Amino acid sequence: MLKHFQRLGGALFAPVLLFPFAGLVVALTIILKNPDFVGELANTNGTFYKMITVIEEGGWTVFRQLPLIFAIGLPIGLAKKAHPRACLAVLATYLTYNYFISAILTFWGPSFGVDFTQNVGGVSGLTTIAGIKTLDTSIVGAIVISGITIYIHNKFFDTKLPDFLGTFQGTTLVSAIAFVVMIPCAYITCLVWPKIQMGISSLQALMVTSGTFGVWLYTFLERILIPTGLHHFIYGPFIFGPAVVDTGIQVAWAENLLNFANSTQPLKELFPQGGFALHGNSKIFGCIGIALAMYKTARPEKKKIVSGLLIPAALTAALVGITEPLEFTFLFIAPFLFVVHAVLAATMAAVMYAFGVVKYGSGIIEIAALNWLPLMKNHSGVMFTQLAIGVVFIGIHYLVFKFLIEKYNVKTSGREDEEEETKLYTKADWKAKNGEGKETNSSDLYSGKAKAFLEAFGGKDNIEQVNNCATRLRISVKDEKKVGPDIQFKAAGAHGVVRNGKAFQVIVGLSVPQVRESFENLMEQN
């Protein structure tokens, strides 16, 4: 069961990867329409303003079509075959599902307690998806319907029909079966979802009123579950789903950013839900403090080597919010340090929230575009509060990690036993053995890693499923006994390996999509 949840979590990350760029576009266009930044260029009748508005509308695509994008994105990670056709089947099925709901509620809305004559939005519980007026099931409905369609696709796509029915094979058969299945799904949704919406409204009120403790607990769970890959199920419903605000924190913040920027009311009063989007601060301030502690405690003769490892990892965490390359340098050798990290991250978020900081998350690039620049005029105090608390926690992380590393003689980078270091330095020999020594360009590098990982997993015949998230290659194998030791993966360039029975996660880094593609190409070639 855990393996299936991990696969789903990884698959959910494909749509999430679209948000950073879209968020930056929206934020920058809002800034460029603000007269405080561009003066007379912000005249609504001017050509500049109109051109910026055109660009802004394009930036809203991802946010306005969120359920549709999640529905289509899920097959990328969960379909076992013919991924493009699975995406097509999901698109058709999800639209069919919403058309069914629209028709049912048009005729029998009052029977389900739904006034379908209302305008969409607000407290109506209604929305439009690809122009279809329907119940607002948010990303929950999209994920469920996409999951059902993917199951049908995996089970029936290769089904052989009699020759005279050959035209109905493949995607056509999948869509036909899904079409029939969507009728009861739509009926059940009309029957159950309005009641769930009432429950969600109560949950939203409860979470918002949970205050500082709620923020602490949310942030702790989001961090502590990273090694399992299940952290997506913590932040997903808050950031992209209806846990605390109907449209999700990410969309709600972007939609109201201009109003927040022009208001002098405290941000915590304007958007208290933003407390559940502070987990990114540990990626900036916490990771910097941890990196400094690891550098300080490294052997003098190893500091130069360690700095080459830690600087890029810390910068990646601080700038774009990808923390695995740093966190996995100490997670496997000292798991208790990761627990400490999660506690400190949660405490930092709670302290920031208590002092009025909200929705300052992810990495510096996103924070600069979505917080610092647009809010500087009326909310500069919040920015300085965030920075002050963050700097304090850099010091706290540094002191705590330095103390624990030295007290318990944790073998972090630069402190390994000599014989362990010798093993690590066999990387060049190991790569030469596998024919990687001649590789010079990035494409060859990805292929080299993929080849090494495939051999470490025991070859093509031992691979059951392949998936990935932002930084991890997720592999299910038939026989875990055929999988090589962690050092074999690290020698090929991995930051670490998570093992859970037949389910493995290889920490690759931001190049994981390219490595996965090369991995799958090698499997097909073999």
From Swiss-Prot:
Record-annotated membrane-spanning stretches: 12-32, 59-79, 88-108, 132-152, 173-193, 200-220, 224-244, 274-294, 305-325, 330-350, 355-375, 381-401
Topology with respect to the bilayer: Multi-pass membrane protein
Gene3D superfamilies documented for this protein: Glucose permease domain IIB (3.30.1360.60)
UniProt-annotated catalytic positions: C469 (phosphocysteine intermediate)
Residue ranges constituting the PTS EIIC type-1 domain according to the UniProt record: 1-417
Matching InterPro entries: Glu_permease_IIB, PTrfase_EIIB_Cys, PTS_EIIC, PTS_EIIC_1, PTS_Glucose_EIICBA, PTS_IIB_1, PTS_IIBC_a_glc
GO function term, MF aspect, one: kinase activity
One GO term of the biological process aspect: phosphoenolpyruvate-dependent sugar phosphotransferase system
Classification via Pfam families: PTS_EIIB, PTS_EIIC
Predominant location category: membrane
Top EC class for this record: transferase
E.C. number: 2.7.1.-
Disulfide bonds: none
GO cellular component, one term: plasma membrane
Localization per Swiss-Prot or TrEMBL: Cell membrane
UniProt KW keywords: Cell membrane, Kinase, Membrane, Phosphotransferase system, Sugar transport, Transferase, Transmembrane, Transmembrane helix, Transport
Record-annotated PTS EIIB type-1 domain positions: 447-526
PANTHER family: CYTOCHROME C-TYPE SYNTHESIS PROTEIN AND PTS TRANSMEMBRANE COMPONENT (PTHR30009), PHOSPHOTRANSFERASE IIC COMPONENT GLVC (PTHR30009:SF12)
Record comment regarding domains: The EIIC domain forms the PTS system translocation channel and contains the specific substrate-binding site. The EIIB domain is phosphorylated by phospho-EIIA on a cysteinyl or histidyl residue, depending on the transported sugar. Then, it transfers the phosphoryl group to the sugar substrate concomitantly with the sugar uptake processed by the EIIC domain.
Function of the protein: The phosphoenolpyruvate-dependent sugar phosphotransferase system (sugar PTS), a major carbohydrate active -transport system, catalyzes the phosphorylation of incoming sugar substrates concomitantly with their translocation across the cell membrane. This system is involved in alpha-glucoside transport.
Protein name: PTS system alpha-glucoside-specific EIICB component
Species, as recorded: Fusobacterium mortiferum
Taxonomic placement: Bacteria, Fusobacteriati, Fusobacteriota, Fusobacteriia, Fusobacteriales
This protein's encoding gene: malB
